[in-house]
Amino acid sequence: MSFSGKVKEELARNIGSARHCQIAELTAFIGMCGTVVINSFDRCSIKIRTENILVARKVFTLIEKTFNIRSDISVRRNIKKQTETYSVIVKKHEDAIRILQATKMIGEQQENAEELHAVNPMIVQQVCCRRAFLRGTFQASGSMSDPNKAYHFEIVCSTEEMAHQICDLICSFSMDAKIVLRKKSYVVYLKEGAQIVDILNIMEAHISLMELENVRILKEMRNSVNRKVNCETANINKTVSAAVKQLEDITYLRDQIGFENIPKGLVEAALARLEHPEATLKELGESLNPPVGKSGINHRLRKLSEMADKVRQEQGGLL
């Protein structure tokens, strides 16, 4: 199962205890993946579609617990795509009107569903209800990337108005949600790992949150180790390049002017480098008698390189 599927499975098992939160979550389901069907006799029914059986059960349970209404569930199989679509249906006109009035999608005195309202601010007035509403929107039309690969959270909306409402709700929790137009849909998204942790906490997907945090910690540890290895590799390459240049300069001086024409202290450093081509500056300094520090041996080797460059210039050699 994908990480996104695990999050939805966890959220589907979370049924809020407060009736106002149950109504807020059901409002999200109706608004995101529900339709109101009106027949020729002006009688209406509600149909909520999802490809996730656990989400379908969640909607069924919410309707039953909140309104004491028994809805029907139908299954439609797509053999070509090998997918199943579950529809939770409230068939009775009176039941559908009751639900639409409670979710404030129609007025309290309205007896038909010809004109549906957008999400009423009163439905998401309390913080707990905002959490429940976002929980519903994600289950209905959301997805998340595998955190091992990338950090991406999104909710796909059919209308710009709904996208802005969801974006504003997420931003009310001090997050920076954005909206992008993708084909004919409006997508509300988050891309930062820390904000995705926050949204999981807001939706109360605590098990998924811990899994994501574990992935983040491991990724940060790997990145830290990689940075350290890269830094050490760069230092090793730098040290090796410097040692190779020193050996070239020392060999050039030995062959061109001879060590007898070079000060004794520099000759000692030159012989030490020839004898220990792979040694670090610290190791070279310690091999001398008496030993010298890292800066001391570095100074001598630099003098040898300067001397070699000078001889090359005098003899018309390449720098």
Positions of predicted regions on the chain:
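N-terminal low-complexity or simple alpha-helical regulatory segments
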Residues: 1-102
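Structural motif
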Residues: 15-23, 123-130, 260-264
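Short, hydrophobic/amphipathic alpha-helical patches that form generic packing surfaces
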Residues: 24-32, 132-140, 271
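Short acidic, hydrophobic short linear motifs in intrinsically disordered regions
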Residues: 41-46, 148-149, 280-282
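Short helix-coil junctions and helix-kink-helix linkers
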Residues: 48-50, 154-158, 287-292
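DNA-contacting interfaces and partner/effector-binding or oligomerization modules
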Residues: 57, 61-82, 87-213
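Extended mid-to-C-terminal alpha-helical interaction segments
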Residues: 198, 202-299
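Short, Lys/Arg-enriched C-terminal cap helix and immediately downstream tail that follows
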Residues: 306-316
